[in-house]
Structures are given as C-alpha cells and as structure tokens.
Amino acid sequence: MSEQPFWQQKTLDEMTDAEWESLCDGCGQCCLHKLMDEDTDEIYFTNVACRQLNIKTCQCRNYERRFEYEPDCIKLTRENLPTFEWLPPTCAYRLLAEGKSLPAWHPLLTGSKAAMHGERISVRHIAVPESTVVDWQDHILNLPDRAR
C-alpha cells in the first residue's frame, strides 16, 4: 500500500517550506495584474503580465529578488492566505485551504507542467507584456475555472 502524498497528509500550516513552494503549479495567474472596482471592491484579472514574468515559461525572472524589482508583488504565506480571495479557483493553495483536491493536471500529480499548459490553465497563451498596454480596462478577462 502506498503512502499518501504530503498534501493529503498535512494541513497547509504543517507543510515544510519546500512542500509549500512545490504546491505552486507555475501557471502565472497570480502574476497577472488585477484591477479593483473602487465602488464594489470587486477584483478583475487582466491579461497584463508583471514585468518580471517570463510569459513563455510562466516563471518569474527574478523570483528570489522579486520584491526588490516589484514592490507591489505580494508574498503568499500560510499566515496571509485567508486574505487572498483573489487567488484563481485552480490555485492549489486555495483548493487545499478549501478542503478540495488538486486537479488532475497539477504538476505534483503529472510530474510536469505539460498537462497544465495543455489545459490552458497557464497564462502563456493570454498574457501580454505590461509595456505594451495603453488602456488596462481593455485587458480585463475571465480566467478558466478548471479545478478538476
């Protein structure tokens, strides 16, 4: 009988830093700029990528020093996770916090990011560089809800 994977054995609070980091599927959705409606506080995703996001790989160009380059970059931690209602419905942190399973395409289950990209969960097919954007409201989008 095989042992359950760590994300089924532990709560988010019990995970090591390495386990916590490995939950990230690398989709890049959290690296897209968001807009907030001033009247309703509703959050809208855009397809505008952070300047540090390599759109092709969906990875941060300067992950270890990202806060130096992007002061508005937000670090997701165990402590502040409950305040991030804007996380996409496919996000492993959000799913596990809500008591749900990882989706079948998640790299921890498949061993690679190919299935995630194939399901078009990553932003590589929709993101545009921040430097090319004139009117941010023209870039509001709806992200896929494929958390299965």
From Swiss-Prot:
Pfam families documented for this protein: CxxCxxCC
Q: Which residues form a coiled coil?
A: none
- What family classification does the UniProt entry report for this protein? Belongs to the UPF0260 family.
Q: Which HAMAP family match?
A: UPF0260
Name by which UniProt lists this protein: UPF0260 protein KPK_1978
